[in-house]
């Protein structure tokens, strides 16, 4: 009887524990069936247990439909903890059998991993729900960052373009000499523009030509100076400055065909063809121009005959006649000794101009230069002393010689132009009222100073 009573108590204890573990255990699992088969309870107890499990399963299905996975997992954890506490208290008071204790432990162990798995699934479900929100936030942040990067790249490209333009501008300024550009612009302004304006002016004057406006001044330069190859250009620039004072007319400067540029030697007298004194230089200049003057006068006669024969054609066509005036200019070097200025010998240049068309002659002299400079210019010892890269005397001596000739040629050009304009002639003021005429105008005019230096 005692054994039967103990078995009955064990069965009641088992039924109480099954009521509490019904929500956790799976009624269809093989482990639960295997544990029950190991206990060896009667068939009635087995039927009652199956009925209770069926009822518990229905309750679990209803609760799962109403609760979320997180709450269900929390309740299962609480139920597992409560069941374990009650079982420990019951085992301590009643001391259940080894078989019942083994069954409870197995059921608890089988239920606990399942509860942990459900908790993990619930966490995965929550992460899956939160993932779209995070992905949307990350997508918006990424698009904003991409737009900022693109705008920054465009700004960098624009700044880089400005830097490249600045560098290009610096490189161009380094490659091109601005001083040379300034000289070029001045040359265009002083040479090309006047020539162009004169050309346009001549074209317009074909319709209504002014008097004495269609005239070409053809200057031929003669000299015997060694080492000076640009004297024709110097004479042209000097005459051009003076020609700006006169409306109309054209200017051409030619170099004598027989004039040859000779290299300089150590003999200064030979290099410059020096003669002694102004009078000897003037005689030599006129002698050198004797033959060219004869040829020029011959050409003038031929041109006059052609102009007379073409008079009728001119009236028919009403086209102006272009006159060519031949000017012969000779440059002659000579030496002087002026004790009032210096005891050393001085170098001067005589500039003599002859107009064969109007029978006009003008002469002047240049600024005296120390003749010793010319000896320095041809002395090779200065090259050995200072080196070829230094500024040697021949460079600045040549520059001073060209400047002195340029000034003298300009003075001769101004004298010639003033004479052609009848400046200083009393008849020029004949048409003015008497009150505007100077009282000294009736006097004889002062003769021109020819620029000669007399010893």
Swiss-Prot record:
<feature type="region of interest" description="Disordered">
    <location>
        <begin position="296"/>
        <end position="317"/>
    </location>
</feature>
<feature type="compositionally biased region" description="Basic and acidic residues">
    <location>
        <begin position="296"/>
        <end position="305"/>
    </location>
</feature>
<feature type="compositionally biased region" description="Basic and acidic residues">
    <location>
        <begin position="27"/>
        <end position="38"/>
    </location>
</feature>
<protein>
    <recommendedName>
        <fullName>Maintenance of telomere capping protein 1</fullName>
    </recommendedName>
</protein>
<feature type="compositionally biased region" description="Polar residues">
    <location>
        <begin position="80"/>
        <end position="113"/>
    </location>
</feature>
<dbReference type="Pfam" id="PF10310">
    <property type="entry name" value="DUF5427"/>
</dbReference>
<comment type="similarity">
    <text>Belongs to the MTC1 family.</text>
</comment>
<feature type="region of interest" description="Disordered">
    <location>
        <begin position="1"/>
        <end position="113"/>
    </location>
</feature>
<dbReference type="GO" id="GO:0005794">
    <property type="term" value="C:Golgi apparatus"/>
</dbReference>
<dbReference type="InterPro" id="IPR018814">
    <property type="entry name" value="DUF5427"/>
</dbReference>
<keyword id="KW-0963">Cytoplasm</keyword>
<comment type="function">
    <text>Involved in telomere capping.</text>
</comment>
């Amino acid at each position: 009887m005692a054994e039967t009573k103990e078995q009955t108590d064990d069965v009641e204890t088992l039924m109480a524990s099954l009521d509490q573990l019904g929500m956790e255990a799976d009624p269809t699992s093989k482990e639960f069936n295997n544990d029950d088969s190991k206990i060896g309870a009667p068939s009635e107890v087995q039927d009652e247990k199956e009925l209770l499990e069926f009822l518990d399963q229905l309750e679990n299905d209803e609760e799962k439909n109403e609760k979320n996975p997180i709450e269900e997992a929390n309740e299962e954890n609480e139920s597992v903890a409560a069941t374990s506490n009650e079982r420990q208290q019951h085992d301590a008071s009643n001391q259940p059998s080894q078989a019942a204790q083994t069954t409870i432990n197995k059921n608890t162990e089988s239920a606990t991993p399942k509860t942990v798995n459900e908790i993990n699934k619930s966490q995965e479900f929550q992460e899956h729900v939160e993932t779209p929100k995070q992905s949307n936030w990350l997508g918006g942040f990424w698009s904003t960052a991409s737009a900022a990067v693109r705008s920054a790249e465009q700004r960098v490209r624009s700044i880089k373009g400005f830097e490249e333009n600045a560098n290009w501008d610096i490189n161009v300024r380094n490659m091109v000499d601005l001083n040379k550009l300034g000289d070029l612009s001045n040359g265009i302004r002083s040479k090309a523009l006047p020539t162009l304006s004169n050309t346009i002016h001549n074209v317009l004057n074909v319709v209504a030509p002014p008097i004495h406006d269609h005239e070409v001044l053809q200057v031929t330069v003669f000299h015997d100076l060694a080492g000076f190859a640009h004297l024709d250009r110097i004479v042209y620039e000097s005459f051009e400055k003076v020609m700006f004072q006169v409306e109309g007319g054209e200017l051409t400067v030619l170099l004598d065909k027989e004039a040859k540029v000779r290299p300089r030697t150590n003999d200064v007298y030979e290099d410059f063809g020096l003669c002694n004194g102004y009078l000897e230089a003037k005689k030599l200049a006129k002698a050198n121009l004797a033959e060219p003057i004869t040829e020029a006068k011959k050409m003038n006669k031929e041109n006059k005959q052609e102009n007379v024969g073409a008079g009728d054609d001119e009236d028919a066509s009403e086209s102006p006649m272009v006159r060519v005036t031949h000017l012969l200019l000779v440059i002659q070097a000579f030496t002087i000794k002026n004790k009032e200025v210096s005891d050393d010998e001085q170098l001067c240049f005589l500039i003599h101009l002859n107009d064969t068309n109007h029978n006009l002659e003008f002469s002047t002299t240049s600024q005296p230069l120390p003749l010793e400079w010319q000896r320095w210019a041809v002395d090779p010892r200065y090259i050995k002393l200072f080196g070829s890269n230094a500024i040697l005397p021949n460079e600045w001596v040549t520059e001073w010689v060209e400047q002195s000739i340029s000034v003298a040629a300009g003075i001769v050009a101004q004298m010639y132009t003033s004479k052609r304009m009848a400046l200083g002639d009393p008849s020029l003021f004949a048409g003015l009222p008497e009150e505007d005429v100077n009282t000294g105008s009736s006097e004889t005019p002062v003769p021109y100073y020819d620029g000669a230096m007399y010893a």
